[in-house]
């Protein structure tokens, strides 16, 4: 298939919906005629040293099908949606040029939205400004920082909770770097539709008909992560000495709850319950976003033949119904 005829496809779904297994099923089904390379759409998988709590594909799995955008940042570093769009767009072109199909797989809906809809031309992260804001927050607290945000950017402050330190910090950073409120960047998109690498029409989604099915899988997976040494993984990250609870990496679901327990904010015995509850809330937000995308091709991930349905739909999209 000529490179310019190879589509880029996306597979999204809530956490624990079976995206990884489904992606391998797609790769196996297409491999005889069209190799597949996977681009991760996951804001946690970008971080090295965070393997168990992110359900990161194993080295063997990554060797089986080429993976991209995994282990590309240290947990001390930030990785923005704008950086993701830039990296994913480049990779889509490179993978097509190799005669392979780019399959974007994950559950970070902000990244998918930025890829499909375009992204505002906001200023990049500025480490020096961020450090000054963190020092200011240490002095006056995040409620004080929220009040400062309300002074310079009332619309953004109105939609953020006073404890949402990560987003408050980013909004203030944008203000200090650009002189413009974050809310002013939300009015227009700078990337024309014709320049975007793919559209939501290329999106396949895994969505459960029965939420109880997904909740059961979430609980099972969290307990399995704990049994696999997740807490030891968080202890190793803490032992570095340069990480803290307000970093984007340490605010990932599971890591945040483990860090809080290790800080003594909650009993360690409550970690499974709190981790599972936070994961369920994440899944709810992911499903809500997916249902706002009418162009998507939705597959019931709790159906007995979910994988067969997905593979058939992908085949039809790639080859127009050919086998």
Curated annotation (Swiss-Prot):
UniProt cross-references to InterPro entries, sorted A to Z: Dimethylallyltransferase (IPR039657), IPT (IPR018022), P-loop_NTPase (IPR027417)
UniProtKB keywords: ATP-binding, Magnesium, Nucleotide-binding, Transferase, tRNA processing
Cofactor entry: Mg(2+)
EC category name: transferase
SUPFAM superfamilies in the cross-refs: P-loop containing nucleoside triphosphate hydrolases
Superkingdom of the source species: Bacteria
Binding site for ATP: 13-20
Swiss-Prot/TrEMBL catalytic activity: adenosine(37) in tRNA + dimethylallyl diphosphate = N(6)-dimethylallyladenosine(37) in tRNA + diphosphate
Region spans: Interaction with substrate tRNA: 42-45, 166-170, 251-256, 284-291
GO biological process, one term: tRNA modification
Signal peptide: none
Residues the entry annotates as binding substrate: 15-20
Entry-linked Gene3D superfamilies: 1.10.20.140, P-loop containing nucleotide triphosphate hydrolases (3.40.50.300)
EC number, as in UniProt: 2.5.1.75
Assembly and interaction partners: Monomer.
NCBIfam families: miaA
Family: Belongs to the IPP transferase family.
General function of this protein: Catalyzes the transfer of a dimethylallyl group onto the adenine at position 37 in tRNAs that read codons beginning with uridine, leading to the formation of N6-(dimethylallyl)adenosine (i(6)A).
Protein name as catalogued: tRNA dimethylallyltransferase
Native organism: Acidovorax ebreus (strain TPSY)
């Amino acid at each position: 298939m000529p490179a310019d005829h190879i589509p880029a496809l996306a597979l999204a779904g809530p956490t624990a919906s079976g995206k990884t297994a489904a992606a391998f099923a797609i790769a196996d089904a297409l491999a005889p005629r069209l190799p597949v390379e996977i681009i991760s759409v996951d804001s946690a998988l970008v971080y090295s040293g965070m393997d168990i709590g992110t359900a990161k594909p194993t080295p063997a799995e990554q060797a089986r099908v080429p993976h991209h955008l995994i282990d590309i940042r240290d947990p001390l570093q930030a990785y923005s949606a704008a950086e993701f769009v830039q990296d994913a767009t480049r990779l889509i072109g490179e993978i097509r040029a190799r005669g392979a199909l780019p399959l974007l797989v994950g559950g970070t809906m902000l990244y998918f939205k930025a890829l499909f809809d375009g992204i505002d031309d906001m200023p990049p992260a500025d480490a020096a400004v961020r450090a000054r804001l963190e020092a200011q927050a240490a002095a006056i607290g995040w409620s004080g920082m929220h009040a400062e945000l309300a002074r310079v950017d009332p619309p953004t402050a109105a939609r953020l909770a006073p404890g949402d330190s990560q987003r408050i910090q980013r909004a203030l950073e944008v203000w200090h770097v650009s002189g413009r409120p974050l809310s002013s960047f939300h009015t227009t998109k700078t990337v024309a539709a014709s320049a975007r690498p793919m559209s939501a029409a290329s999106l396949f989604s895994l969505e459960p008909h029965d939420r109880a099915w997904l909740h059961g899988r979430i609980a099972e997976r969290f307990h399995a992560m704990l049994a696999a040494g997740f807490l030891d993984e968080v202890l190793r990250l803490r032992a570095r000495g340069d990480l803290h609870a307000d970093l984007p990496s340490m605010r990932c679901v599971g890591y945040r709850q483990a860090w809080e327990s290790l800080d003594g904010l909650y009993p360690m015995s409550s970690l499974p319950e709190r981790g599972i509850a936070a994961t369920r809330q994440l899944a709810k937000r992911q499903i809500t976003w997916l249902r706002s995308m009418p162009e998507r091709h939705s597959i019931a991930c709790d159906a007995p033949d979910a994988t067969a349905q997905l593979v058939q739909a992908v085949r039809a999209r790639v080859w127009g119904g050919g086998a």
